[in-house]
């Protein structure tokens, strides 16, 4: 059994799919996709191959995570709408990794984070564990490390200057309260949220971004994470 980690799957979230290169022919894959759709008198979801994006994300997970492995998704499963959640759960339930081996940490697009009950029952049918934050051990077979799990970067990172290539809401003040404060230098954190294309977008090397953009749109194994923490 191996633990795998990812974040920001954004199933059935056409805007994010566009940013990831899935705009249809005739449209540009960037953050102007809403404006492009408006000018074409279309909905964003009709301008983007979001279903191809979702199939690719699902296929990449199934190519990596087996039926005896554990999968941790650190938030932003979908856009947050009922339509998006419905499609997301279809993909989650198609994973080779069984329900009891799936863990969900809630992100800012997951309404349950804010105490809302909408969709919670459906989430419990697809995941064996759901929480705002978590903690688990990771190992490479020799070294064992304890890591915190949160959708968001360290709370202190919210005060840092903006970094190119990150989501516009990466340091949104109202999200700060959901982030974990780093109370000790030995604390290690796995997170997502920023959509950065590198696992180390912040100076603090005791946190690793497991978001899809940082890992070529695939989950990352616990052994690889242990190696990275040891290098830093």
Which residue ranges define each predicted feature?
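Active-site neighborhood of phospho(di)ester-bond hydrolases with catalytic His/Asp-centered motifs
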Residues: 6-7, 71-76, 102-108, 149-150, ...
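Core catalytic region of metal-dependent phosphoesterases/phosphodiesterases
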Residues: 2, 11, 15-138
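Active-site environment of divalent metal-dependent phosphoester hydrolases
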Residues: 10-17, 78-82, 108-116, 155-158, ...
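Conserved beta-sheet core of the metallophosphoesterase superfamily
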Residues: 125-232
